[in-house]
Amino acid sequence: MKVGFIGLGSMGAPIARRLARSGFEVTGCDIAPEMLEAFDEAGTKRSADPMETARQTDMLGICVRTDAQLEALVDGGALFEALGKGGIVILHSTVSPDLARKLAALAKTYGVGFVDVGVSGGGPAAIEGQLSLFVGGEDGDVERAMPWFEAIGKSIAHLGPVGRGQEAKLLNNLISIANYGMSAAIVDVAVALGFDREQIIAALMAGSAQSFALKVAPGFVRPRSGLGAPSSLMGLYDLLKKDVELCRNLPPSDPVAMEALLASCDVMLARIKRAAAEAEASK
């Protein structure tokens, strides 16, 4: 099956690579020359033209960063027209659920299917086909896209119509970022009380407080694999802040609880921003 994938960043490129290794004929597309050059998977094609990529494929994956980028890419429906009747769009970007629903309705007028698929697990999990997928879309579209999902995911949850994939992904990110922020803050309190950082983390991890966030959050923004570089830290900050702002627009059943969650997220964002400033000052 011929598929296109637009957006070859830290998540898009690994997904596209996994698809190629799973037998799909993949054309990777990105308007950034450095991203396109880095996509060197054997047996794939490369393109800097999203419209041409759409014309040459049956399924089109999208993993751009922001709502504005996604709307510019769709170009009022021109992208769907290029893909053609019977094509299907698989949206892996994390964007506004309302925008996903709006674009799905627009795609339908061109005879194009549309599913929104939030992913969790990161690039390494994508390469291994071990992502968790949060899927929103009509049953028929989801069924058609299932070979794609099975290639990249270990867990595939079809949660309802288009928009549900985005909402579930935002909930996942809200929990994750809040947990990171809370765990990092707790360790800071412990250190202020005079505990050894590593010793108290090990002790807490042996009790009911244990979590993935507690294990990794205190060192989350320390230099490792280039993440300690100022530009990398600010890139992480911008990405997480975008997701937190999208979460602020979710309708809360309990405004007080939502504010508490968002406050924990803000702790993590402030921590990353501070680390970026410290890294910049130490250059």
Language-model features, listed with the residues they occupy:
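Interdomain hinge/lid region at the active-site interface
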Residues: 212, 216-275
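Active-site-proximal catalytic alpha-helix in oxidoreductases
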Residues: 133-136, 157, 161-193, 205-216
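NAD(P)+-binding Rossmann beta1-loop-alpha1 motif at the extreme N-terminus of oxidoreductases
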Residues: 1-63, 87, 158, 192
